[in-house]
């Protein structure tokens, strides 16, 4: 079931949550709506579900306009962040709830419902837990039961609102892998909301990056990370080093230093610009070389296989972040307080008019 979002806008009083949103989601896709708090991602999800009405614009499921269709008639499965399981019902009763409240003519038999529950418990790897209550389950198990309940009614579309947000980091990572595998097996069109960049990049087929009620970029996880189209996307998807200077025929002038910039800048003779690069795209050397910036190591900390360094440059006014593989760090034998030479690589160029305030 494909989803088409056409010119959708939504305001809450004077606050504009969504501004002229257009988006197409293909049948069987798993799409992440990624953005900071207040970016409009949950409002968009609720409008797709029919839980909120858009001020303008339309929603289509396949070719059917569902803008005015009640949420109960949209055949949508919705999974909330905090499970929303019925505490007084067993696991089996929670999963089967949507089936048991169907109109009598549409309701499966008790035998069919019991069989469906068994199938779904097997699907979410929780066989034998039919008679347990939510309080007897871990957070990860509760969320899997919530997902099984959403799938029980065989929805055309599955919507998930920060489904792993209430769980600890290890459980979140395990459930991400499980959700990706489950989606590959089930192939239901799915949209999930998250503010977790790693989660969006790890799980989804495509990422929709949102900011201030607008879509900044849509693309595969690799596309949005490696080819960000705006400063916001670049900054939101990970740590970044920022250099401000003037571009002149292939180089950006940073006070006393020059950086070679992407080929797009060769035709620019003298224009203010901002250069972005990731900490893992920073090379460190003990020898001065072309495009190198002298900097003093101020802080070093190790996290697993990565060494994270903070260096001062430009008369101690600005900090550079560098990430090195632990082996490379030990090979260089770097020490706090020493001066090294940093060469930024994989530079992305933005101009002042591209920044969103």
Curated annotation (Swiss-Prot):
InterPro entries, A to Z: AAA+_ATPase, ABC_SmlMolc_Importer, ABC_transporter-like_ATP-bd, ABC_transporter-like_CS, CysA_C, Mo/tungstate-bd_C_term_dom, NA-bd_OB-fold, P-loop_NTPase
Compartments (UniProt record): Cell membrane
Organism domain of life: Bacteria
EC number: 7.3.2.3
UniProt similarity note: Belongs to the ABC transporter superfamily. Sulfate/tungstate importer (TC 3.A.1.6) family.
Function noted in UniProt: Part of the ABC transporter complex CysAWTP involved in sulfate/thiosulfate import. Responsible for energy coupling to the transport system.
Name of the protein in its database record: Sulfate/thiosulfate import ATP-binding protein CysA
Natural source organism: Halalkalibacterium halodurans (strain ATCC BAA-125 / DSM 18197 / FERM 7344 / JCM 9153 / C-125) (Bacillus halodurans)
């Amino acid at each position: 079931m494909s989803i088409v979002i056409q010119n959708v806008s939504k305001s809450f009083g004077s606050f504009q949550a969504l501004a002229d949103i257009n988006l197409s989601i293909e049948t069987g896709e798993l799409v992440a709506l990624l953005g900071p708090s207040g970016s409009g991602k949950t409002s968009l999800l609720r409008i797709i579900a029919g839980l909120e009405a858009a001020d303008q614009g339309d929603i289509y499921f396949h070719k059917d306009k569902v803008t005015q269709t009640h949420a109960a008639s949209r055949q949508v499965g919705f999974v909330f962040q905090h499970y929303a399981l019925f505490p007084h019902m067993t696991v089996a009763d929670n999963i089967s709830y949507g089936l048991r409240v169907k109109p009598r003519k549409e309701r499966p038999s008790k035998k069919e419902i019991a069989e469906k529950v068994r199938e779904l418990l097997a699907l979410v790897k929780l066989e034998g837990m039919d008679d347990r209550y939510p309080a007897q389950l871990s957070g990860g198990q509760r969320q899997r039961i919530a997902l099984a309940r959403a799938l029980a009614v065989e929805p055309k579309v599955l919507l998930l609102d920060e489904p792993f947000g209430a769980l600890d980091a290890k459980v979140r990572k395990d459930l991400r892998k499980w959700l990706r595998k489950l989606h590959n097996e089930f192939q239901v069109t799915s949209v999930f909301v998250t503010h977790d960049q790693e989660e969006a990049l790890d799980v989804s087929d495509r990422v929709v990056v949102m900011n201030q009620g607008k879509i900044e970029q849509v693309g595969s996880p690799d596309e949005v990370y490696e080819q960000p189209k705006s400063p916001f996307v670049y900054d939101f998807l990970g740590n970044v080093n920022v250099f401000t200077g003037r571009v002149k025929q292939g180089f950006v002038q940073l006070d006393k230093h020059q950086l070679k910039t992407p080929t797009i800048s060769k035709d620019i003779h003298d224009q203010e610009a901002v250069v972005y690069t990731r900490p893992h795209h920073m090379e460190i050397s003990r020898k001065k070389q072309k495009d190198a910036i002298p900097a003093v190591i101020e802080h070093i900390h190790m996290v697993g296989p990565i060494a994270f360094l903070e260096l001062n440059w430009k008369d101690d006014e600005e900090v550079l972040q560098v990430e090195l593989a632990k082996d490379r760090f030990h090979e260089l034998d770097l020490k706090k307080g020493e001066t090294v030479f940093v060469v930024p690589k994989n530079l992305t160029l933005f101009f002042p008019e591209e920044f969103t305030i």
